[in-house]
């Protein structure tokens, strides 16, 4: 293999150690390798950085192994060009495997320019990404705790969820606290209802006439407190996220124009893909990186169905979730596209396809700095008509005819003229 870089290094990163191999290519001489092992404490990583600087290394390569690569990258990124590669792309040939051999293999790949760099956003975007990913975890924990609470109510035969549309609204929480205190009758608890729920007080009183014991009340108090604690954490996170989003207000204003994209989805898009679309070769590469492109499986000239490739799980999950409110937008292109695909391919594949469309729209809006333009619900009908005409024309021409297609002339108006007013 042709060696392109004179001085480079490969790192095999683990939880407690980093094995570093410096590869030196001097004209007219055989390549030389220097291998050292460092710990992963901050002062040890700084010693690694100083050693690489003494060896005049210009590029450093490593695998994206879990989260262990992140502290190493943070120490080295200011002084070296750091290439973080997908572990599946760097895998060595079968044979004896040691940490030293892995570091040497990575150094060889860096030297020959054979590692495809993974997308590593800037530090502000990495911080925003950490906040949003933790917010998602809290949201999932909140949903799980709410489900546990409602299952507990069903166990005690409290049918609050059958009458109230939102168990955790103002009325629902007041009733839950009354259930915990055990100081009111079902009719008195029904009087705590507010708004439209007051019209259902009789039905609500019957729903609250269950069989709650002390254990149920104890668990209910803990679960309600847990839900409220998570809500407080999410509120604090939202404030910090809003501060981090201050430099990206223009991009946020563009992205929220897309149907189904609220401020959370827009923030996730910015944190996961950034705002500079030039880091992706094309919109197709971005879709593949996100795991939203169709699978490709071709053998012996035959194309077969295949699952979508693995990609950015956080981005993919958020966009698939955003697809459902997007398809509920009346008169939108997404709605028509979803129901056409759902009839042929099923609901899940249709949702993934809409998520792909949202990502494509976001890419072009960020790359060109343009507003969102909906194609409309009738767009696919017009496309279908054009394709049908072209297919029929082609079939007739194969039979030896010359076809000229013109639009139909409007029919003359046959209604009698109205009599002039006297």
List the predicted regions and their residue ranges:
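A detector of single, family-specific signature residues
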Residues: 1-422
